[in-house]
């Protein structure tokens, strides 16, 4: 049971809470009533706004739509007026542009092309919208006239401004690749820049709007003519220069003229003078050697003066030959200045058929290089003017005349070489070697230039190379056979037993091959493998060339043996073979031939030395008929202090007389013989002098004091030293 006090307190607490709750409820009820009132007021305001907005919309929308329609109508009117103006302008194009078209594009290309664009648009409009309109025919006719005028202007610009490239500029262009000191590149300006830009614009217009390719034919015809004339002009330059000065130009002249190249000339291989002609010239001019010499100039003196690997010009240049060029074993009265003056004074400068061959060869080689450079330049020009898909075909047509001219000239060279082979004029055939070498060196550039041209165009150079390789191989083979089969003719044999012309010519020919080892090897290899020169190794071709040279030397040796039998005197035959073998050996050693021969014949040098010694021994046997008279083994035995019988005195007389007569006869005969090599001549004299002096000295010592005659001076005609002096005068026509 709760106490009364706690119950009373709890009741008061509950009553207070109830009173608070009632107050809260009353507040909430008042707030709700206010909210309802506000909501009603807002709904009333919104309803009024909506009503007013609808009234406004109903009044504005019709006005807006009406304004929009008016704007559309205005735009349509403006477009219609613009279209009318545009259409009307097409009807005025003919009259507006006729004067410009009639006057042509010269000097006003930009304006002219603008007029042509207007005419083109007018044509397109009338074709699409009024194909039966007379205006269409009018503007089409005007368009055709304008196009023809542009084509004519294109032709005129190309014709007036396309100039032949001067030979001097071409030579500078060719020299540019080899001149390491060149400070700037040589460039060709085929057309002035302003003209080039006009030509490019016209060509592009004709391609895009003219739909006409005739201008491409005009282009290649004009440029083809200039290319061909440029190359022919270079060739004529060589001919004129050679006829006036003997050389195309001279960079040594300090005062540069307009016709003087600005760069050093490119060294190009010339041809080789014929040994036969030179030998004939020297003999005619009386250039006899000194002691023991002959009319034959030593081979070393005839070699081109350019170093190995260089490119020889004329076959002999007197100004280039010096004492160092002549073998120590050949002593000759060879004075460069006097020789040159003697030849020029008596016969004029050497400018005969062989000089012309040099000029033709050098000119052709330069023309080949010029073609490559000019063709490259032409393609660069063509690439700016001709559309890309027409460039290769146009370029092919452009280069045909010049290329055909070069190929025809090359075939003529092959034909001339073929005729020279028939005549056994093998030195003339050597013109093929420098040309073939240059063609093969230039072939990569050729292939690059001709890339994209027709197959027939690309195959022209390989065909010419094959022809030259074939004719060169035939020349080499026929030369070897000719050396072997050269007839033995007494009138053609040297009376003094010196070097035969066949030997000097053969060695000279082989030495000329040293400058063209790779080319000659390619010729031989092409026949060996029946394929192009690209399918063999350089070592293989070197062995083939070595084998060939050994074959020629073998044929030469056999022929010399045969020729030596023409001599009735075995001693002269031995001297002849000795001179020729010694000449061959010295020539091989002087040049690089000995190394080339050693590729396949290691013992060649030793073999020639053995042959030389054999001939010396054969020659020495000719003195046996002299020394046998006084040889110890053939002398009778005499008792010292015993008086000689008549028979014994007669034997001694016969010995002295036989020796004297034999000595005089041999000295008289052999005095006219020749051993051009000073070293060999002195060696043979000394050896023979030693043998004869020792034998004669012993004989004289034994019988000189014997009273075998009342007139000893009749039989003892020579002292020992006198005999030596007589032998010293052997092989000396001046003694």
Curated annotation (Swiss-Prot):
- Any one Gene Ontology biological process term? protein transmembrane transport
Name the tissues where it is expressed.
Abundant in the ventricular zone, the outer subventricular zone and the cortical plate of the fetal cortex.
Record's Pfam families?
Exo70_C, Exo70_N
Q: Which cysteines are joined by disulfide bonds?
A: none
Signal sequence, start to end = none
Location of the protein in the cell: Cytoplasm, Cytosol; Cell membrane; Midbody, Midbody ring
Annotated membrane topology is: Peripheral membrane protein
Task: State where it is primarily located.
Answer: cytoplasm
- Spell out the residue ranges making up region: Disordered: 239-268
Q: Which GO terms describe its molecular function?
A: phosphatidylinositol-4,5-bisphosphate binding; protein-macromolecule adaptor activity
Similarity annotation: Belongs to the EXO70 family.
Query: What does the protein in this record do?
Result: Component of the exocyst complex involved in the docking of exocytic vesicles with fusion sites on the plasma membrane. In adipocytes, plays a crucial role in targeting SLC2A4 vesicle to the plasma membrane in response to insulin, perhaps directing the vesicle to the precise site of fusion. It is required for neuron survival and plays an essential role in cortical development.
Quaternary data: The exocyst complex is composed of EXOC1, EXOC2, EXOC3, EXOC4, EXOC5, EXOC6, EXOC7 and EXOC8. Interacts with ARHQ in a GTP-dependent manner. Interacts with RAB11FIP3.
Disease named in the record: Neurodevelopmental disorder with seizures and brain atrophy: An autosomal recessive disorder characterized by brain atrophy, seizures, and developmental delay. Disease severity is variable. Severely affected individuals develop symptoms in utero, which may lead to spontaneous abortion. Patients at the mildest end of the phenotypic spectrum have onset of seizures later in childhood and show developmental delay with mildly impaired intellectual development and minimal brain atrophy.
Q: What is this protein called?
A: Exocyst complex component 7
Record the organism.
Homo sapiens (Human)
Provide the gene name from the record.
EXOC7
